[in-house]
């Protein structure tokens, strides 16, 4: 009888919903923590990878440009390394914004792969950093006794500080159609930040004065840091 009463009062783990729920919550918390840690590590590794590749390619591009001008090999390499690292990190951050947006994850993955391939091949740095850095190097030609302000200006990537969210939202948006998706040479127009062609039906942002067009995530992320056009450097 005593044994029967003991068995009837015994509650195995499988029949205790509260204990099972507690264990499941612990498992979910562990999975969430592990996922967050792995995501942080992966983001840090990718950021370091983009910065490293951008630095190396930027230094190479800057050295070649500096060698062809009076600025010098070392100064050109230094400017190119810094510009390449900054630009590569901004491209990576724009990629993350697109990944977290409502766009197709498969399309974002293809875009990220294309960016990585372009970065490794040097196309991103050569096409976007090269012209801006060449202008910075040439502006310093003949400067022997440069002041601290002059040295700071050569590494500056924008003419003014970033814009607030309200000011960025006021910049006009346009929809890509068959009439505005070609440049002056007849080629498909593209975003100079991510280097991807504009697609019909896409909504892009057209900057005032210069009217250069960019994807919304790309240019918004830029304008929060710089108050100028990333192509022509004209202040907004």
Curated annotation (Swiss-Prot):
Q: What is its main location?
A: plastid
Q: Extract the CDD domains matched here.
A: RING-H2_NIPL1-like
Q: Where are the transmembrane segments?
A: 45-65, 79-99, 105-125
Q: Which domain of life is it from?
A: Eukaryota
Its Gene Ontology molecular function terms? zinc ion binding
The cross-references to InterPro entries, in alphabetical order and at most eight, read:
Gly-zipper_YMGG (IPR027367), Znf_RING (IPR001841), Znf_RING/FYVE/PHD (IPR013083)
Q: How does it assemble?
A: Interacts with RPOT2.
Q: What is this protein called?
A: NEP1-interacting protein 1
């Amino acid at each position: 009888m005593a044994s029967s009463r003991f068995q009837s009062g015994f509650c195995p783990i499988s029949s205790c919903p509260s204990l099972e729920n507690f264990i499941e919550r612990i498992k979910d918390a562990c999975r969430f923590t592990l996922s967050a840690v792995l995501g942080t590590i992966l983001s840090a590794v990718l950021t370091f990878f983009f910065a490293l590749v951008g630095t190396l390619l930027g230094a190479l591009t800057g050295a070649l440009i500096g060698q062809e001008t009076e600025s010098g090999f070392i100064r050109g390499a230094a400017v190119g390394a810094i510009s390449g690292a900054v630009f590569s990190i901004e491209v990576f951050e724009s990629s993350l914004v697109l990944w977290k947006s409502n766009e197709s994850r498969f399309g974002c993955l293809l875009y990220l792969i294309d960016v990585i391939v372009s970065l490794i091949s040097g196309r991103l740095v050569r096409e976007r950093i090269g012209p801006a850095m060449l202008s910075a190097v040439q502006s310093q030609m003949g400067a022997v006794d440069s002041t601290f302000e002059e040295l700071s200006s050569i590494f500056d990537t924008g003419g003014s500080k970033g814009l607030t969210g309200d000011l960025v939202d006021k910049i006009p948006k346009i929809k890509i159609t068959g009439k505005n998706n070609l440049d002056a040479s007849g080629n498909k127009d593209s975003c100079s930040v991510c280097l991807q062609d504009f697609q019909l039906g896409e909504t892009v942002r057209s900057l005032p004065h210069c009217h250069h067009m960019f994807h919304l995530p790309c240019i918004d992320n830029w304008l929060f840091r710089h108050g100028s056009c990333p192509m022509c450097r004209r202040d907004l």
